From Swiss-Prot:
<dbReference type="GO" id="GO:0005743">
    <property type="term" value="C:mitochondrial inner membrane"/>
</dbReference>
<feature type="topological domain" description="Mitochondrial matrix">
    <location>
        <begin position="1"/>
        <end position="7"/>
    </location>
</feature>
<dbReference type="GO" id="GO:0005739">
    <property type="term" value="C:mitochondrion"/>
</dbReference>
<comment type="function">
    <text>Component of the MICOS complex, a large protein complex of the mitochondrial inner membrane that plays crucial roles in the maintenance of crista junctions, inner membrane architecture, and formation of contact sites to the outer membrane. Constituent of mature MICOS complex, it is required for the formation of cristae junction (CJ) and maintenance of cristae morphology. Required for the incorporation of MICOS10/MIC10 into the MICOS complex.</text>
</comment>
<dbReference type="GO" id="GO:0042407">
    <property type="term" value="P:cristae formation"/>
</dbReference>
<dbReference type="GO" id="GO:0044284">
    <property type="term" value="C:mitochondrial crista junction"/>
</dbReference>
<dbReference type="GO" id="GO:0005654">
    <property type="term" value="C:nucleoplasm"/>
</dbReference>
<keyword id="KW-0496">Mitochondrion</keyword>
<keyword id="KW-0472">Membrane</keyword>
<dbReference type="Pfam" id="PF15884">
    <property type="entry name" value="QIL1"/>
</dbReference>
<comment type="similarity">
    <text>Belongs to the MICOS complex subunit Mic13 family.</text>
</comment>
<feature type="transmembrane region" description="Helical">
    <location>
        <begin position="8"/>
        <end position="26"/>
    </location>
</feature>
<dbReference type="GO" id="GO:0061617">
    <property type="term" value="C:MICOS complex"/>
</dbReference>
<protein>
    <recommendedName>
        <fullName>MICOS complex subunit MIC13</fullName>
    </recommendedName>
</protein>
<comment type="subunit">
    <text>Component of the mitochondrial contact site and cristae organizing system (MICOS) complex, composed of at least MICOS10/MIC10, CHCHD3/MIC19, CHCHD6/MIC25, APOO/MIC26, MICOS13/MIC13, APOOL/MIC27 and IMMT/MIC60. The MICOS complex associates with mitochondrial outer membrane proteins SAMM50, MTX1 and MTX2 (together described as components of the mitochondrial outer membrane sorting assembly machinery (SAM) complex) and DNAJC11, mitochondrial inner membrane protein TMEM11 and with HSPA9.</text>
</comment>
<keyword id="KW-0812">Transmembrane</keyword>
<keyword id="KW-0999">Mitochondrion inner membrane</keyword>
């Protein structure tokens, strides 16, 4: 009985995390224009390091352990982030769109090869 409840709890937790991630992406319009994605990236660069520091300080206070000071993350500049992002998305989507026809073509070639060499 406990195993079933634990399994259900794990499923609900994973589903909640996945649903929250989908909601966040939709709410922040990260799949929309590149300007929104760039703004979200800049916001994350500003917010995440202080939050990690505060969380590590909280853990140290609660547990009595001392964590070593982490090095500061390097500053990464994305001058043409928009172009790279868009070209990556276009490449992936075009590959996905031709995948069924390519799979059919390759399977046909493979079948012909097997027929030739099995004689």
């Amino acid at each position: 009985m406990v195993a079933r409840v634990w399994s259900l709890m794990r499923f609900l937790i994973k589903g909640s995390v996945a649903g929250g991630a989908v909601y966040l992406v939709y709410d922040q319009e990260l799949l929309g224009p590149s300007d929104k994605s760039e703004a979200a990236l800049r916001k994350a660069e500003e917010v995440v390091p202080p939050a990690m520091y505060q969380f590590s300080q909280y853990v140290c206070q609660q547990t009595g352990l001392e964590m070593p000071q982490l090095p500061t993350p390097p500053k990464i500049k994305f001058p043409n982030f928009r172009d790279s992002w868009n070209s990556g998305i276009i490449s992936v989507m075009s590959a996905l769109s031709v995948a069924p026809s390519k799979a059919r073509e390759y399977s046909k070639e493979g079948w012909e090869y097997l027929k030739e060499h099995s004689k």
